[in-house]
Amino acid sequence: MEQDEIYGEFAYVYDEFMDNIPYEQWHDYLHGLLIKYGVTDGIVADLACGTGTMTKLLADDGYDMIGVDMSYEMLDVARQKYCCQDFDEIPYESESKSDSLKDAMEYNAQEQETGESKNEILFLNQDMRELDLYGTAAAMVCVCDGMNYITDENDLLKVFEKVKIFLDYGGIFIFDMKTGHFYENILGSRTIAENREDASFIWENEFHKDTGINEYLLTIYSLVDDENDLFERSEEIHHQRAYDIKFVRDCLEKAGLSCLEVYDAFTENAAKEDSERIYFVAQRHEKKTILA
């Protein structure tokens, strides 16, 4: 199964099984970093936004949010959660067509000018390796280990290059990553299982230290017929990769982004060997002024 086939059926039970994630705490930390590095308003793109929980929290802060994800199903859930009411005039794009993006973003801008904006979110069905926005953003974020899903080194560089293209000069890019320490020593080869009223899942993990790849075999049982108590079984295989901090720094620089800080998650301390999750803060190089 390819990475673009993940978060299919799982998307529709994702929020139910991820209800233990402290999104408010994660949001407060992320928002604090945005403020610290000067992003107090403007357009912010949330890459690998999933069902849009973090996207919505940032929209509530007043940012003009764009949520980007390659899973149509995850975005379908996001739209059901946040966009069904008063959102018919803003298109949900499944293709990266600049004219459509332009129309949607200009619509948002007009609402901002007239004071009618409700912090609507523009959701785009795109692979972040092929990111295509109309114009640039003040910041981009990618949290909840979305960047770990980029398992090829060349693809990681490609993502960073796309981010650089669509960031304002001086714009900020914040993303998190799970570490090798987490995959090897915390998660290990554990099997996680949960049973809920309408769905169950079995999550089997295997970490390959030589490649830094963690493989998840996810088996989902979803209730499809309540009357007859029938469940549908589906499987997804997910792959995430742990990267060396130095490699990520070098990759950012190669793409034209300066790595400002690497934090131990949810602290202001530098990342360390036993960090389980780390946050990178990068910035697009300022445009050089050529004096006559």
Model-inferred region functions:
Residues M1-G42:
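Conserved class I S-adenosyl-L-methionine
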Residues A45, T53-E130:
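Class I SAM-dependent methyltransferase SAM/SAH-binding core
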Residues A48:
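Conserved S-adenosyl-L-methionine
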Residues D132-A139:
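A short acidic, Gly/Pro-enriched loop at the edge of an enzyme's catalytic core
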Residues V143-D145:
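Residues lining the SAM
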Residues L157-Y169:
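A short glycine-rich, Lys/Arg-flanked "PGG" loop and its adjoining helix->strand segment in the class I
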Residues I174-R249:
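SAM-dependent methyltransferase
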Residues H239-A292:
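C-terminal lobe and adjacent flexible extensions of AdoMet/dcAdoMet transferase-like proteins
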